[in-house]
Amino acid sequence: MAREYKIEDYRNFGIMAHIDAGKTTMTERILFYTGKNHKIGETHDGASTMDWMEQEQERGITITSAATTTFWQGRDGKKRRFNIIDTPGHVDFTIEVERSLRVLDGAIALLDANAGVEPQTETVWRQAEKYHVPRMVFVNKMDKIGADFYRSVEMVGSRLGAVALPVQLPIGAENDFVGVVDLIEMKALTWDGTIGAPATVGEIPADMADKAEEYREKLIELAVEIDEAAMEAYLEGTMPTNDELRALIRKGTIEVKFHPILCGTAFKNRGVQPLLDAVVEFLPAPTDVPAIKGIDVKTETETTRESSDEAPLSMLAFKIMNDPFVGSLTFARIYSGKLTKGVSLENTVKGKRERIGRMLQMHSNSREDIDEAFAGDIVALAGLKETTTGDTLCDPLKPVILERMEFPDPVIEIAIEPKTKADQEKMGIALNRLAAEDPSFRVKSDEESGQTIIAGMGELHLDILVDRMKREFKVEANVGAPQVAYRESITRAAEIDYTHKKQSGGSGQFARVKIIFEPHDGDDFIFESKIVGGSVPKEYIPGVQKGIESVMGAGPLAGFPMLGVKATLIDGAYHDVDSSVLAFEIASRAAFREGAQKAGAQLLEPIMKVEVVTPEDYVGDVIGDLNSRRGQISGTEARGIAAVVNAMVPLANMFGYVNSLRSMSQGRAQYTMQFDHYEPVPTAVAQEIQKKFA
C-alpha cells in the first residue's frame, strides 16, 4: 500500500490553551467539521451529517486520545491530513508538555477573548518558544460578555513579547458577534450559528471599511519584511497578490517571526472553518521544519533524520495511554522511514528489541487497524513490552537515539496507603501503570515500616498523580506529609583495623580487615583492594565489598543512604578453618560503621535549580523571598518582556512555594525547578533533622 497523502500535505499540530479557554469545544468542533468533510465523498443523500451529529450528541465526543488523525479540504480544493496532538493542560509536568511540543510541528494557541493572555498561556508559550514551535493564535469566546479582540492582540505583544499579526477582525462582539473580516481577501464572513453551516461571504460592513484598510496595510508591511524581493517591490509601489501575501505569512510563521491571529467562537460555530484553512496555509508540514537531531549509536556523534520515507526508520514514543479496549497503547511519531506491521525494531534507549504487532490510527470517533505507516505519521502501537516515554524505536541496522531524556532522580517522597484493604491490590497496579507512563515518578516500599513510598519531582507532581489514581483507577488513598530525600557522606579519610572473632563450640568465625575510607567527588561507591601476598585470600575479597555495600543504604547520622565513599582494603588476616566469606562480610560491615563515624559523617540535602519567570514589577519580591528560603540567586535576565530569576534553593525550603509565588505575583509568575546537586546541610538544620530521624 503506497502513501495516500504526500508528506507535504501533513499538518502535525496541537492546541495550547489555558484551562478555561475552550480547548475541548474547539477540538470537538474541529473533529466535527473535518469528520463531516471526510464523510462528504462517501454519501450522496446528505444523511451522513445527521448520523454523525446524533452520534456526536449521544457520545459527547471529546478527544481523549493523545493524537487524532483527521482530514480537511483546503481553500485550493486539495485534501490535507491533520494529526492533532493533545498537549497536557497541566504545566507542572514540564517533561510532558515539552515532549508533546517536541512531536508537534506547529500549534494553535487559544485565548479567551475576555481574559486575554492568562498565566498558564504564558508558561506553555515560553516552552514552545524554547523549541521554536510555529504558532497561530485564535481568540475564542468572542460571544462572551466582556470579549475584547483588540485587547487580546495587545496582550500577545505586551505579555508574551511576541509579534501579533491579525489576519482577521471581528464583526461585532459579545451577543452581536456574527463573523469576521478576512484581511487577505478583504471580504466579510458571517455565520448564522447552526452547527456545520458554511460562512456567507459578503462585503465588509461600511462602518468597518476604514479599520479593515488600516489593519490590512499593517499586515502587508509586516509580511513583506520577511522577504527582500517582496520588500523592494512593495517599496516601489507593487502590492503582493493575495496568494503571495499568504506565502509570505506562511514563511514568517514557520520562521517564528510573527504569529497570525484569528478569532471566533467555537461554541457558536463561528470562525472554525477559516481556522482550519489557516492551519493548511500557515502551519508547517513535517518537511518545512528542520530535520530531527539524534545521536548515532555506532559512532556516538550527532546525526539527523530527514522527514522522508526513504530515510532509515526512526520514531519517538511520546505517550503511553491505557485504552479500555486495547490495553496499553504507545503513541509514537515516525520521523523518518516506513513502518510495517510485524517488523522487529531496536529500542536504542533500553538496548532491547520490540516486535511491532497491532498498529492503530486513532480517528475522532473510531480506531482503525493499519498495516503500515510513513514518515510524519503518528501511530498507536499495542502490546509493546519494553518501551516507555521518551524511547526511540528504529531500524536495528541504523541505530539512532532521537532524544536523550535525562530523567532526574525524584527529590520528594511521600508515604501512601489505600483507604480500604480492598484497594490494596488495585493501588499497586495503578502505581505501576503511572510509573510506566511517567519516568520521573518512582514507587518503592520501605523495608522497615512496610509502607509504600512514592517519589516525584515536586509536591504538585505527586498531588496530580494521586488525583489521577482516584479518577482513572478509582483508588482512594491516604497520603503522608512530603519528605525530602536527604543523603549522608563523609568529609575526611579514616583508617580502620577491625577483627571479627566468634568462638562458640565447633567451627568459629574469624576475619580481620584493615580498610581506608575516604570521600570522593562522585555520588557512587568505589571499592578497591590493594592486598598483596595473600593476607586476605582472593575468594574472600568480594565478601568485604558486599559487607560495606550492605550498610551503605543507612548512614550513621539519620539512616539516609550514603554517597561518594571510596573504600580501599589494604591489609587483613584469616584463619584456615574459621574464616569464610560471611566472616569477612561481618567484619567489613562493622569496620564501615566505625569508619563512617571517624571519617566525619555529614548530612547532604538536595539543592534545586529554580527558574522563576515573572513580570518585571515583582522581581524584587521574588528575589527577597528566595533569599529567605536559603536560596542563592545565580542571575537575572530579560526574556521578552518578562524577567527570569535563576537560583539554587534547598528543596526543604521549597514546600508550598507555588502558593506563595501565586499570591506574590497575582498569579502571573510561574516557576520550574529540577534537582541539581547535593550539598552539606548547615549545622543547625542538620541537628533538627537528626533529632527527627535518628
Curated annotation (Swiss-Prot):
SMART domains to which the protein is assigned, alphabetical: EFG_C, EFG_IV
GO biological process per UniProt: ribosome disassembly
Example GO molecular function: translation elongation factor activity
Subcellular location: Cytoplasm
Keyword Cytoplasm in annotation: yes
InterPro entries per record: EFG_II, EFG_III, EFG_III/V, EFG_IV, EFG_V, EFG_V-like, EFTu-like_2, G_TR_CS
Top-rank taxon: Bacteria
Principal subcellular localization: cytoplasm
Keyword field: Cytoplasm, Elongation factor, GTP-binding, Nucleotide-binding, Protein biosynthesis
GO cellular component entries: cytoplasm
Binding site for GTP: 17-24, 86-90, 140-143
Family: Belongs to the TRAFAC class translation factor GTPase superfamily. Classic translation factor GTPase family. EF-G/EF-2 subfamily.
Free-text function comment from the UniProt entry: Catalyzes the GTP-dependent ribosomal translocation step during translation elongation. During this step, the ribosome changes from the pre-translocational (PRE) to the post-translocational (POST) state as the newly formed A-site-bound peptidyl-tRNA and P-site-bound deacylated tRNA move to the P and E sites, respectively. Catalyzes the coordinated movement of the two tRNA molecules, the mRNA and conformational changes in the ribosome.
Name of the protein in question: Elongation factor G
Naturally occurring in which organism (per UniProt): Brucella abortus (strain 2308)
Gene it is expressed from: fusA
